[in-house]
Curated annotation (Swiss-Prot):
CDD domains, per database record: ADCL_like
Coiled coil: none
Family matches, as PANTHER family: AMINO-ACID AMINOTRANSFERASE (PTHR42743), AMINODEOXYCHORISMATE LYASE (PTHR42743:SF11)
Gene it is expressed from: pabC
Pathway: Cofactor biosynthesis; tetrahydrofolate biosynthesis; 4-aminobenzoate from chorismate: step 2/2
GO BP term, pick one: tetrahydrofolate biosynthetic process
Known EC number: 4.1.3.38
Modified residues (N6-(pyridoxal phosphate)lysine): 146
Gene3D superfamilies the record matches: 3.30.470.10, D-amino Acid Aminotransferase, subunit A, domain 2 (3.20.10.10)
Protein name (Swiss-Prot/TrEMBL): Aminodeoxychorismate lyase
Lyase is among the record's keywords: yes
Length: 293
């Protein structure tokens, strides 16, 4: 069961108009995040990023946290996801317009949401990084949206294949480290954590933000900037972040080995991340949504 424009329906019954500008011109954005025992982690940050993107695309839609929580609770029940552990995709496209390809504000967006049951034990615990020959494209606007424009990522995925143990790493046109195909990238050298800055054209990832705001809690400095590949390849450890996969260490990038276990910073950040998830579940009641079934 999925949600489309205020209604819950079977996937086979869902219909999107061929005149939706999300389909015709790629005008749409989405958020992907994770539910832990029915609770969405860092939802406020996902909403904040979504609202910024909608404003940039001139899609008029008020993102109501209360409505999203109700939507998620109902989708969990309708899909019989009893433990509340799921992957969520919330998608908002421009919707139908009869004005053609002209500058306009979209006031009838298409809102779609679906959840997939997630088994934590099925997720990878580590990754191998491969530097991509295809370069990261620049954002279509002034900043990277989590939008329908995924051609650059698709070409990158074709280059490295579909092995879930491998993540492709983009460089910018001038050779600076950018981001992964589905992740942000971090590394530690000595007592400092490094990650590419937003001016490399990367997505402002939610888990990336978590690390930037909490690095001091594990006693490490954090710097953002434009860094050559050599900085990553000479690091003491490296890892990737993703809202569903969380914080995943790289065991190697190209021919550089970082070891088979999480490094000092990776382990500390993983523990901090898990702690915040547990605190959230405790504060929000965790499986309480099941009592209303």
């Amino acid at each position: 069961m999925i949600y489309v424009n205020g209604r819950y329906m079977e996937e086979k019954d869902a219909v999107l108009s061929p005149f939706d500008h999300g389909f015709l011109y790629g005008i749409g954005v989405f958020e992907t995040f994770r539910l832990y025992e029915g609770c969405p982690f860092l939802l406020d940050w996902h909403i904040e990023r979504l609202e910024r993107a909608l404003k940039d695309l001139q899609i008029e839609y008020t993102v109501s946290k209360h409505e999203i929580l109700e939507m998620l609770d109902k989708l969990l029940k309708l899909n019989d996801i009893k433990d509340g552990n799921a992957r969520v995709r919330l998608n908002i496209s421009a919707g139908i317009s009869d004005k053609g390809f002209v500058a306009q504000t979209y006031d009838k967006p298409t809102v779609l949401c679906f959840v997939n049951q997630l088994k934590p034990e099925s997720l990878p615990l580590q990754k191998e990084g491969k530097v991509l020959s295809i370069r990261r494209n620049t954002p279509e606007g002034s900043f990277r949206l989590k939008s329908h424009h995924y051609l650059n990522n698709m070409y990158a995925k074709r280059e490295i294949g579909n092995d879930p143990r491998v993540e492709g790493i983009f460089l910018t046109e001038d050779g600076a480290v950018a981001e992964g195909i589905i992740s942000n990238v971090f590394w530690r050298k000595g007592r400092c954590i490094y990650t590419p800055s937003l001016d490399t054209g990367i997505l402002d990832g939610v888990t990336r933000r978590f690390i930037i705001e909490n690095a001091k809690d594990i006693g490490l400095e954090l710097k953002t900037g434009r860094y050559e590949l050599e900085a990553l390849l000479t690091a003491d450890e490296a890892w990737m972040t993703n809202s569903v996969l969380e914080i995943i260490p790289f065991t190697k990038i190209e021919e550089v080995n970082y070891g088979s276990q999480s490094g000092e910073a990776t382990s500390a950040l993983q523990l901090l991340y898990k702690k915040e998830i547990k605190n959230m579940i405790h504060e929000k009641g965790g499986r309480a949504w099941r009592s209303t079934q």
